[in-house]
A protein has these predicted regions:
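Ligand-binding pockets and gating/stacking loops
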Residues: 2-440
Length: 440
């Protein structure tokens, strides 16, 4: 979809304010990625799943686990149950058919560092890549920005390089098109303004020709040291990516369309989503990590958690709105998770501390496995062993869900299970879980 059409649709949906739209529109960049896409959202700090996708109500004789359950019951829509907290009811009603909730995931730690590592690599020791890195290396190893990371866990284990970004489309545009000095409104053909360059395109073409000739001479020299040869090859690949990246600048939202930092939570998650969506729409990226902080609520838990959950849900809604509008929703998988969860009771500061049993949410457009919850926890949020095939409680001979089990199933879902790259990082859990049903 062309950028002009995309922005008009966004405005009509109320996603962004009304804008002036550039006439210089184009489709996906030449040779852009048109295959599967993966976006992961990290709720940094440890989210409280008892007020989200694994709702818990207070039990007689026990300390309160949630304050909302003093007057309300969990909200069930289809096969999914959420807490009636923040804007959860709106969110689950709109998206339950697109989601699978995996509860009772044992992160085996109360450490932020280990929890992040475990949740996003599938292992609680260093040495395994982020799922997004593996995905990008498998599906789009030569894309200019195949793997985009806005923070959080981003280990690549040398499978691929990542592009580190912030949620600042204006700044990114300056980087990907550094020769653009500005625009002058002097021609009705250019609604965005006539481009003014530091150097004219003809001059840059001449400089580029000389650069390529010199690079070829260097690469043709005999007896290059391995590091020197690798550096020259990396430079050659980087220069080839400049053309698509220049085109990518046309997909980025204009300054007045960029979501500002959230005033309550001080997160710019929506702006991160806008940049990631632009990269997906342009075909220059196939995997992205976005993150929001603030979930480490050791005091005043409910008051601090509520706006965070609301922003998270709104941002997921924005992801799917942009994906539908740009026409790539049927290629997108979204995974949402956190370091771990929070304790099944409040502390003396009305906060909640760290708890290892958490959840993961997976979303696609119209999946066969949607509107379901797998994994079990008891009334005090302890993990319950389940039968890997029936997914029913089996305390005597069942298995607890660990991040490695989630990653094994995600690899199956995403077509990575038989990848030679994935074979370098096996889990071999032997648990045989089938969260998504028969994927053969």
């Amino acid at each position: 979809m062309k950028r002009r059409t995309l922005l008009k649709a966004m405005s009509s949906l109320g996603v962004i304010p009304a804008l002036s739209y550039p006439a210089l529109s184009r489709g996906i960049v030449d040779g852009g990625h048109e295959g599967p896409l993966l976006l992961q959202i990290h709720a940094e700090g440890g989210w409280d799943v008892t007020s989200y996708c694994d709702p818990k109500v207070n039990q007689p004789g026990e300390r309160p686990i949630t304050t909302w359950s003093e007057t309300l019951d969990p909200v069930r829509v289809g096969g999914v149950e959420f807490a009636p907290f923040a804007n959860n009811e709106w969110f689950v009603e709109k998206y339950h058919q697109q989601m699978l909730v995996i509860n009772g995931v044992d992160l085996q730690t109360n450490s932020h560092t280990t929890g992040i590592l475990h949740n996003w690599s599938g292992r609680n020791a260093a040495g395994y890549p982020a799922l997004t890195a593996l995905f990008a290396a498998h599906y789009a190893p030569t894309a200019p920005m195949a793997y985009v990371n806005f923070g959080g866990f981003g280990s690549t284990e040398n499978l691929i390089s990542y592009t580190k970004l912030q949620g600042d489309p204006a700044g990114i545009a300056e980087i990907v098109e550094p020769n653009l000095q500005g625009r002058v409104i002097d021609n009705p053909v250019y609604e965005d303004g006539h481009p003014v360059y530091f150097r004219q395109p003809a001059e840059l073409s001449l400089i580029e020709a000389h650069r390529q000739a010199r690079l070829q001479r260097l690469q043709a020299r005999g007896q290059l040291a391995p590091r020197e040869a690798a550096n020259l090859q990396a430079f050659s690949e980087a220069t080839r990516a400049r053309g698509p990246l220049k085109d990518f600048a046309d997909y980025l939202p204009k300054a007045e369309a960029i979501f500002p930092q959230d005033e309550i939570t001080h997160n710019n998650l929506k702006a991160q989503v806008q940049v990631a969506s632009s990269a997906f729409a342009a075909g220059v990226a196939c995997a992205a990590d976005v993150q929001m902080g603030g979930f480490d609520t050791h005091d005043d838990h409910d008051a601090l958690h509520k706006p965070l959950v609301q922003l998270l849900n709104e941002s997921i809604d924005l992801i799917w709105t942009l994906a539908e509008t740009a026409g790539y929703a049927d290629r997108l998988t979204v995974v949402v998770g956190s370091d771990f969860s929070r304790t099944p009771e409040y502390n003396s500061q009305q906060g909640k501390d760290h708890w290892p049993i958490g959840s993961v949410m997976v979303m696609q457009k119209a999946p066969s496995w949607g509107s379901r919850v797998v994994g079990l926890t008891d009334e005090r949020q302890n993990a319950i062993a389940i039968d890997p095939v029936s997914l029913q409680a089996d305390p005597s001979s069942g298995a607890i869900i660990y991040p490695k089990d989630v990653h094994e199933q995600l690899r199956q879902l995403l077509g990575l299970a038989d990848s030679p790259l994935a074979a370098r990082f096996p889990f071999n859990s032997g648990s045989g879980f089938r969260f998504f049903g028969d994927l053969s």
